[in-house]
Every structure is written in structure tokens, then in C-alpha cells.
């Protein structure tokens, strides 16, 4: 009998915290399957989900305000362990008969909590031991309200000077609340705390591993598709590349990929995609060379949003044209990942964090009547990368920096021209090449060059050069919601600038963007 990698599962209820997805990712890293649902998930759905444990996440609301969200009653009727984090602890306390009040002393940022209770959750977990034997944890706090009276049968787990009940526990029922955030890296022992809850208290086995996920996904694809044929829009990005590798392993020649080369890709990228998938892996890939069509449609357009729409529409037109030449296609594969699913599921609650979704294909002729196959829809981006490696994709492809869907079309400010794209491609290649040589590529989260349609005077030998300006952009970020500009060494910047100006005739000046997000965005357009 096949292994059920979803058998041991944790339910996470979202009350709107910016950290909720992080909780899910941490649980998955432990090797346990979990799902994230809005706080107002109905009781019957919770019972059907049949979790081994439930985590109530944080949120921006105040428990003692009217109409603030509450956990469904089924959470406390299932007789499974429950961990409340921040707001989750507060609503748990309130719903079970305790009290929550506002506080004049808010706690945001690093804090030390004293572990004052003997519970299974924190037994043997500490960062410090005082001379008098008090155990301490370095944690991350983000709260204004606090629990002032615990429900019956609960004991104090942890405290701070301004928050005497910074944690509470009822070992008999497996109920725990912590006012701090174990899911963020600033809480040093957070991983151990979550592992203790998920594995030791809830009894979940580590079934959710890269190799098991691949085997399970292959079995599911084969069961869904049978002997039918599948079409995939291959972009060369991480998601579509992993889908291609996974489907090829599952169904072989039943998969056909269409790779639209829009002329706005990185240097040699089109050839690299074809070499990897068609030549090395034997995947059926149709390459549509459509540079002229994209550039013709973009001619004269300088507005960033309009450029995006033109590129999107042109892609769909070309993909449709190629797809219509194929016979006997029943399924369309897409690289939908779990954050896209969370967004649509969370929309009804109004509390969930909204994520910009990504779809490889925006539309297909209705007469094709294709069914969707989405083998990555349960996975976070970091999990997609791990199974990419498991499937044998090269590390450099799987961990390549993000590249926008419209490609260089939004890294050329203003109107897009072939001359600009060719210059930008070469400059970007030099920048990335030097980052790799200096061992800075994987220290940055995203790095690229922006073409600016302005000219500047330069001197080359004894002559005057009047040529284009480009900007280097490199950032460090964890979640791409905020980012700081990367403090690259001056020597590295000097090398990159020198190479770009000396090797590319059309550039006379190189600048470095030192804007963080916010207020700036990572991409310029």
C-alpha cells in the first residue's frame, strides 16, 4: 500500500498575521504536512480535515473589540492538541473563560521570557540559565493586548516584566499558548518549540519529505491524467521548470511543452532552456521564436502597465496559436503554488494576507476545453526548489534569482526596442557573472541591470562618447515584501562598471541603486 504523506496533518487557522505562512513553512520543514485556512473555517470542514493538532496563528485584531475573530468551536471539541500564538493565545484564553486586556506597555521586537512552568512544550528548551536557575528564551514579540487571567486548569508557562502571562499551558489536554512568535528566526529556539508541539505532543511523523512528495505527486498525476496528453507553457522559471521535470518523469511523451521566446529573456536563456529540457531530458518542447511579434506590439508604448498587458496578451496569442496545432490534448498544466491557493481561499475572510498570484497561462481558447493539472499546488516556493533538486534539475537553475514575467520589458524604462534589449542583456550577464565570481550571487536575493533611455557623456581614449546609462540593482530580502539594497563591495562594483563600459559600445555610465523597499519597489517598473 502506498505511503499516505498527508496522513499526519496539522491545521493552521489564519487570523491575518503577516507571519502565518511562515508558521506553515516551519511545520513543513519539520517534515509534517499542514494546511492554512481562514479562521472562519466551518466546524464540519475542520472535522473532515481530521488534524492531529491545530495552531491558532496571530493577527492584527484586538480580542476585546466587538466582532473580532474567534476560533471555531470545533477546535476545542476535537480533543487534539492546540497551540495558540500571539492573537491565537488571546482568543483561546478568552473563549475558554480567561480574560484579555489592552496594555500600556506594548512589546514589539526582541524580548527575553522567563520559563516559569514545567510543561511538555518547553521542557529542556532554553537559551539562558540564570544563577538562580531561571530558564530564559530569546524571542520575538509583536503584541499590545495581553492575557490577564488564564482559563481554568491552565498554568503560567512563561513571563516577562510587562507581560506576566507570556505563555500558558494545560498539559493534560495538550493546550498551549505563547505570546511570542516561534515561527520567526529571531526566536532562536522557535524551530525546536514547533517541532516539540508537532512531533512530540501531536504525534506526527516526518512523512513530508522531498522524495516522498515527488513519489506522491507522480502517483497523483498518473491517476488524474491516465493516458491523456498534457500541455505546459514552459517559461524557464523555477515553477514551470519543476512542473516540466515532474510531469516528464510521471507521463513521459504524453507531455508537450510550448516555450515562447519573446526576445526579452536573459542572454542565451532560450538556448539554455531548450538544451536542458529537450536535449538533456528528452522532453517534447516546441520553441516559438516570437521576438518580432512582441517588439512590434510594444512599439511606441512607454507606460509600464500597458507594456505588461501587451506582453501578456501577445504571449497568450502565441501560446494559443501553438496549442491549436496540437491534437488530442486534454490537460493544461500550470505552476500554481500554495500561496496562490491561500490567496483565493482567504479572500472570503477578509483577514488573510493578500499575495500576488502567478499563472503561467492567462487564457486559452474555450473550444479546447482543457482540464487543469497543478502538481505544485500544495507546495511553497522553497519546497518547489527542493523537489526540483530531487528531480535532478541543476542547482543554478533551481536557485536562480526571480525574473519578472514580462522579462526585460519592465527593465527597459519607457519604450522597448531591440537595441535596448540587446545592450541590457549583455550588461545583465556581466553583472551576474561577476557576482558569481565574487561569491555574492547567493548572498543577494535578486540582482539585475536596468536600462535607462537617457544618454550621458563619457570619454573613451581620446574620444568623446555619448551613450546610454544603466543602473545596477541588488537586494537582500527574506519575503520580497520588504528588502534592503545589498551592500556590495566597492571593488566588485568597480569591476562590474569597468567591464560593462569597456565591453559594451552603447553604455557610457553605470549607476548603483541604493533604494530599499519600501519606499522603492525592487523592480523599477
Swiss-Prot record:
Q: What is this protein called?
A: GMP synthase [glutamine-hydrolyzing]
Task: From the UniProt record, list the reaction(s) this protein catalyses.
Answer: XMP + L-glutamine + ATP + H2O = GMP + L-glutamate + AMP + diphosphate + 2 H(+)
User: Under the cellular component aspect of Gene Ontology, which terms does the record hold?
Assistant: cytosol
According to its UniProt entry, the function of this protein is described as: Catalyzes the synthesis of GMP from XMP.
Record-listed ATP binding positions:
235-241
Q: Which PANTHER family match?
A: GMP SYNTHASE [GLUTAMINE-HYDROLYZING], GMP SYNTHASE-RELATED
The record ties this protein, via NCBIfam families, to: guaA_Cterm, guaA_Nterm, PRK00074.1
The family database entries (InterPro entries) matched by this protein are listed as: Class_I_gatase-like, GATASE, GMP_synth_C, GMP_synth_GATase, GMP_synthase, GMPS_ATP_PPase_dom, NAD/GMP_synthase, Rossmann-like_a/b/a_fold
Q: Give, as in the UniProt entry, the pathway in which the protein acts.
A: Purine metabolism; GMP biosynthesis; GMP from XMP (L-Gln route): step 1/1
Q: Whom does it interact with, and what assembly results?
A: Homodimer.
Which organism is the protein's source?
A: Pseudomonas putida (strain GB-1)
- The chain positions of domain Glutamine amidotransferase type-1 read 9-207
Question: What keywords sit in the KW lines?
Answer: ATP-binding, Glutamine amidotransferase, GMP biosynthesis, Ligase, Nucleotide-binding, Purine biosynthesis
Residue ranges of domain GMPS ATP-PPase in the record: 208-400
Please name the Pfam families in this protein's record. Answer: GATase (PF00117), GMP_synt_C (PF00958), NAD_synthase (PF02540)
Task: Give the gene that encodes this protein.
Answer: guaA
Kindly list the GO molecular function terms attached to this UniProt entry: ATP binding; GMP synthase activity
